[in-house]
Amino acid sequence: VIMLRPTQSAIVFVQQLGRGLRKSPSKEYVVIIDFIGNYEKNFLIPIALSGNYTYNKDALRRFVSEGSLLMPGASTINFDLVSKKKIYESIDRAKFNDTKIIKDSYLHLKHKLGRIPNLADFDLYDSIDVLRIFQNKTFGSYHKFLTKNEKDYKIKFTPLQEKYLEYISSKFAAGKRIHELLAIKLCIEYQENIITRLKERLLNEYKIKFKEVNYLPIINQLKQEFATGGAKATFQDAIFIDDNLNTHHQLIELLQDSIFKKQLLELIEFGINRYKTNYTNTHKDTDLCLYQKYTYEDVCRLLNWEVNAVPLNIGGYKYDQRTNTMPVFINHDHDANQGGKYLHRFVDASTLICFSKPNRSIDSDEIQRIYDEANNHLQIHLFVRKNKNDTTSKEFYYMGQMHAINEPFKVQLPDNKNSAIQFTYRLENEIRKELFDYIIQKY
């Protein structure tokens, strides 16, 4: 089957493809050759072929990269290099948090159901990832999206109620850890002794032991004392617990609105289901899952830092004394790595060459700490992303813990003005082959 067509709709493309697959009974296979048109929207091709309508850029890039590895059954797919390049460029340009994409996906699901979808419906019917709605700066919550775009939605909340919904939506609804979601649920259900009840519920229902290191960061998030910098003011009034670790009187008053309470609980259940689906298989004694994706803020939170760190202050890596942890963030750029030896780069799937921040000495506390981690028990965690210019998916793959090997040495940086210390890390877990290939390849 040869297809020559513009790329306008993932759904129409699949329907066209389905017609071509009606092979005769005597034929064992069919080959489809697709000549891609309309380069602006050819990101719809991996969406159509993968059936992944979440509009997650990195997931689409990986599908184009890995193709047949991710296809179910006996089907195979191959993209030539020019097609890969064009599709990657289209994915990079696309704005998947765009209101039109969100509205079109919402309307398609609404027409399918014959009613306003609830949060769980988006996952149940493989529609757009609701996180795209939460991450859209115009909305921030499903309630606000419906208020602006659904004429049949008549529910009104106060600005403060909306802030609570937006805070949970943006910070916890992805389900990357159960603790905060469960704590907020307990604030609604019991209103007293929240942390004590949280410890009991975690152990009894999830077999998770509440660690002492969890205590401060979770309380700080519930009291709006975790955020720093300009972000601190955004949700400063959405307070969940008071100084006695009971539900804050302000929230108790707002919960008198039964519809608000219902939406809070629905949002929390959505996050808990995401957690159960994606994040229960934590690595070693951490709250992180190998090969899952995390933002800078996610990492600070899940490593149990007392307060968040502004990304600009992290600068590639940052040490937290209270938890004795140091996350290392690598932006892997194939073209840049081809051009300069003084850039972070992989030697193989378990070995990484890294550089310190400028003008450090080998004798500095920072470098000595890294090389003495066997004695000081420093935990060094690696996070890698492929394209730092992606404004939608600002997330890194978690690759596990690593250890410094060989001797560090001083190098002069390409600008000839600054020096740095070069050192080598060995990962505890070799990076999964298909993920490693995806990260290091150009297309």
Predicted features, each with a name:
Residues 389-443:
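Compact mixed alphabeta submodule
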Residues 161, 166-168, 287-395:
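Acidic, glycine-rich low-complexity segments with interspersed aromatic residues
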Residues 49-185, 198:
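Long, largely alpha-helical accessory region at the distal end of helicase-like NTP-driven motors
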Residues 168-175, 179-223:
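Long amphipathic alpha-helical coiled-coil/heptad-repeat bundle
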Residues 113-117, 188-197, 332-345, 390-394, ...:
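Short, surface-exposed beta-strand/loop "edge" segments at domain boundaries and coil↔beta transitions
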Residues 205-334:
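Charge-dense, extended regions
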Residues 6-53:
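Conserved segment of the helicase C-terminal RecA-like domain
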